[in-house]
């Protein structure tokens, strides 16, 4: 058992080495950048043609996607700064808080991606049994941009799954059970 593990089990604090902090901060900054990219693509996504105008704000799923990406970007920035600025050793409460917030952000972003993916799917393929036709025949570029934004959101979701694994490993392997 190395010194880091002994510190965590013997007391209520955990030493994070520079590499751990750097990797986690890079993952969080990457999540922030991808969230902002997905958010900006969706916000700028609007089209107007003979069939009418369409914007992300016309669809609740896309409004939720924008909100979730905004929350994720803000949390990613704040948590990256917190990880780098936290004094060593960090307390059990801080580790638990990061774990909990990472879980919440993971599920919020995953839900936003899933509901938006369903909306994009319906826009591309419609629903023939209830006579919904494809909207992408009329609003092609809107659908393509929405799909790109959803892909960015799922990549963010994957990064947050990785961050959740890191924070859960840190919490459950280095601290005694409550």
Swiss-Prot record:
One of its GO terms (cellular component) is plasma membrane. It comes from the Eukaryota. Homodimer and heterodimers. Belongs to the Casparian strip membrane proteins (CASP) family. Keywords: Cell membrane, Membrane, Transmembrane, Transmembrane helix. The keyword Membrane applies. Signal peptide: none annotated. The chain crosses the membrane at residues 23-43, 70-90, 97-117, 146-166. This is CASP-like protein 2A2. It comes from Arabidopsis lyrata subsp. lyrata. It holds the Pfam family CASP_dom.
């Amino acid at each position: 058992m190395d010194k880091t593990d002994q510190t965590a089990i013997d007391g209520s604090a955990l030493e994070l080495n520079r590499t751990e902090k750097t990797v986690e901060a890079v993952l969080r900054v990457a999540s922030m950048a991808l969230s902002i990219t997905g958010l900006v693509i969706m916000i700028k996504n609007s089209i107007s043609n003979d069939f009418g105008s369409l914007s992300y704000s016309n669809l609740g799923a896309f409004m939720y996607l924008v909100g979730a990406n905004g929350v994720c970007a803000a949390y990613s920035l704040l948590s990256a700064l917190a990880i780098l600025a936290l004094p060593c050793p960090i307390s059990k409460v801080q580790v638990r808080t990061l774990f909990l917030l990472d879980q919440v952000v993971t599920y919020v972003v995953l839900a936003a991606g899933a509901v938006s993916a369903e909306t994009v799917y319906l826009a591309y393929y419609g629903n023939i049994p209830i006579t919904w036709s494809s909207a992408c025949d009329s609003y092609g570029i809107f659908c393509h941009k929405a799909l790109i934004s959803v892909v960015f959101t799922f990549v963010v979701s994957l990064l947050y799954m990785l961050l959740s694994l890191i924070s859960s490993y840190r919490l459950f392997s280095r601290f005694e059970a409550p």
